[in-house]
């Protein structure tokens, strides 16, 4: 029935037979699954939004959502349902993927409003753009499911989806595993409050070289970055750090060495007088932007043959499924009605009011990039999904079209970012939906129920993300050091460059050719380019997490590796949640009451490094202790 080794086919049938037996005693879409899924969607959506706005990266929430669900359903509610837990993680993980798409673009609208002195985008506008992209992402994925999830079961592993199914099938360990996530959450929450709430020590440590003028080095001692590095692994982390080393330890000193007393646009002072951060902001950031743009487009071009194959199989395979519960998707007529209704809504939505051609642009490129995303995550996982590349390609094309039709200035840029937002979220949601449907396929879930769960998660998460963005903007400001929003800043630069023709194109083209060179030598271009674009402080901390995982992988102890992933998921969620709570205190005007640095109490850089090392020790001890307890039991 499926291509590939018979062993794998039998394995899937075994899971489906097990599920058919349990279906006599349980259901999928319960009030518990609905409520718990919504809560997790809000939590992981908010946490990932904060993480993405701070460091420009997000991570998958499917496995931690499944683990927490099993812990609650099994330990507190005293029942065990694999399908109910699968529905919880399906709804809950929607928040992370929608946040990943939203933070890439939407903050640009706030930054333009601040720069031009116009009204901030309304909560309604932000939420509706997010919800529209989320719903379209799920609906575009529906006709692709049978071709990619079923027919190519053995050729497309969908790493996160398969891993999540293993967690669900090992449900008896749910309580113990949930504790690992919660311990990571607690550790990060306490750490984050000490660093950025009480300001007992700075969360960033800088080092400058006296002998190599212009060079800079540092580390952001943040729990979430360690978690990201551990989840990504040493290889991806090393690509990020390599790009950062090129920017901060090679290119920046080269600018100072060659530039000297010269003034080079966009800086307004002599290069030799600029600080490391000014060198990065005036030069390296634009070089990195060119590299990221080129890397994203290169990644898309490489997937074109796969896209054509996927589209053909989707058209041929949709509707050929049987009447069995595990083969039913949302009916195609409802999918089409939903897509048309959303596009019409975007045409009449206040503040945006897309033209019909622009709505059709979203439909065509939205489905195209949904196909790209779905196929890509099946091969390399959601963490390597080139969403930023898709967003850049969309913004470039949309901006050129709008400029040719006379829609320029702030209005034209707003429309371009709005279109980019929807398509970016479409790509992120389609990738997440495919991972969840892969999990459901293995454990024997009902596809149409999972798809409805994703739609619910998209609506709830869209409302939550709108609230989180407004809260963070009110507390700080997008583009400021506390909330740099690196990806949205990049998208803003892309649109401004096309509309205004005042970007330093020479620097951007240098970045483009760096990306081409990196691709030629066989290094994954996107993570390298992102490392070049982001400050080295982020990549350094991420590398620490990657090295810790590499240590356990060398010991060939998969249990340690998985325990670390769960703890790391908790670190990311804990820091994100405390970051949002600190934003609330800033809006209420009470954050200064917690600030000990204002009273002369601060441990300085030494305290930062000591706290960071303590966090690593805690992480190692928790992983080993948990594993020892499980072995003893």
Whereabouts are the PLM-identified features?
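Accessible peptide chain termini
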Residues: 1-2, 23
């Amino acid at each position: 029935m499926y291509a590939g080794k018979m062993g794998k086919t039998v394995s899937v049938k075994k899971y489906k037979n097990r599920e058919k037996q349990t279906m006599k005693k349980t259901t999928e879409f319960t009030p518990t699954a609905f409520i718990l899924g919504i809560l997790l969607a809000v939590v992981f959506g908010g946490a990932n939004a904060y993480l993405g706005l701070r460091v420009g990266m997000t991570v998958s929430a499917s496995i931690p959502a499944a683990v927490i669900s099993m812990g609650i359903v099994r330990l507190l509610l005293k029942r065990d349902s694999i399908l109910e837990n699968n529905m919880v993680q399906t709804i809950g993980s929607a928040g992370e993927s929608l946040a990943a798409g939203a933070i890439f673009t939407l903050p640009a609208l706030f930054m333009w409003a601040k720069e031009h002195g116009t009204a901030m985008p309304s909560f309604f506008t932000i939420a509706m753009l997010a919800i529209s992209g989320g719903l379209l992402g799920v609906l575009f994925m529906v006709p692709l499911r049978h071709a990619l999830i079923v027919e190519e079961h053995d050729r497309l592993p969908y790493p996160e989806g398969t891993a999540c199914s293993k967690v669900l099938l090992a449900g008896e360990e749910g309580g113990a595993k949930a504790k690992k996530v919660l311990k990571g959450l607690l550790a990060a929450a306490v750490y984050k409050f000490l660093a950025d709430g009480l300001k007992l020590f700075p969360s960033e440590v800088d080092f400058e070289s006296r002998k190599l003028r212009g060079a800079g080095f540092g580390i952001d001692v943040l729990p979430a970055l360690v978690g990201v590095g551990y989840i990504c692994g040493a290889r991806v982390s090393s690509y990020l750090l390599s790009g950062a080393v090129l920017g901060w330890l090679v290119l920046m000193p080269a600018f100072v060495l060659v530039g000297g007393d010269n003034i080079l646009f966009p800086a307004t002072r002599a290069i030799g007088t600029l600080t490391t951060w000014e060198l990065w902001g005036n030069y390296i950031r634009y070089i990195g932007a060119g590299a990221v743009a080129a890397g994203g487009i290169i990644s898309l071009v490489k997937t074109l043959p796969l896209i054509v194959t996927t589209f053909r199989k989707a058209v041929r395979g949709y509707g050929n499924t049987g009447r069995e519960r595990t083969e039913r998707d949302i009916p195609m007529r409802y999918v089409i009605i939903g897509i048309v209704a959303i596009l019409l809504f975007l045409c009449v939505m206040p503040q945006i009011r897309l033209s019909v051609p622009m709505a059709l642009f979203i439909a065509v490129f939205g489905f195209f990039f949904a196909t790209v995303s779905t196929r890509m995550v099946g091969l390399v996982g959601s963490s390597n999904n080139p969403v930023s590349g898709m967003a850049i390609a969309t913004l470039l094309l949309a901006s050129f079209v709008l400029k040719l039709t006379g829609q320029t200035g702030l209005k034209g840029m707003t429309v371009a970012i709005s279109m980019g937002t929807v398509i970016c979220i479409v790509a992120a949601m389609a990738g997440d939906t495919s991972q969840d449907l892969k999990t459901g396929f293995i454990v024997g879930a009902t596809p149409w129920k999972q798809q409805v769960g994703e739609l619910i998660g998209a609506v709830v998460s869209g409302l939550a993300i709108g609230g989180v963005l407004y809260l963070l903007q009110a507390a700080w400001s997008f583009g400021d050091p506390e909330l740099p929003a690196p990806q949205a800043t990049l998208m803003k630069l892309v649109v401004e460059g096309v509309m205004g023709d005042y970007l330093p194109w020479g620097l951007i083209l240098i970045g483009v050719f760096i990306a081409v060179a990196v691709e030629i030598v066989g290094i994954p271009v996107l993570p390298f380019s992102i490392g070049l674009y982001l400050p080295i402080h982020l990549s350094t901390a991420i590398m620490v997490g990657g090295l810790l995982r590499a240590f356990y992988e060398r010991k060939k102890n998969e249990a340690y590796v998985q325990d670390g992933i769960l703890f790391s998921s908790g670190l990311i969620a804990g820091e994100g949640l405390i970051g949002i709570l600190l934003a609330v205190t800033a809006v209420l005007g009470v954050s200064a009451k917690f600030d000990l640095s204002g009273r002369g109490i601060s441990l300085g850089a030494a305290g930062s490094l000591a706290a960071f090392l303590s966090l690593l020790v805690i992480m190692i001890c928790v992983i080993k202790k948990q594993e020892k307890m499980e072995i003893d039991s």
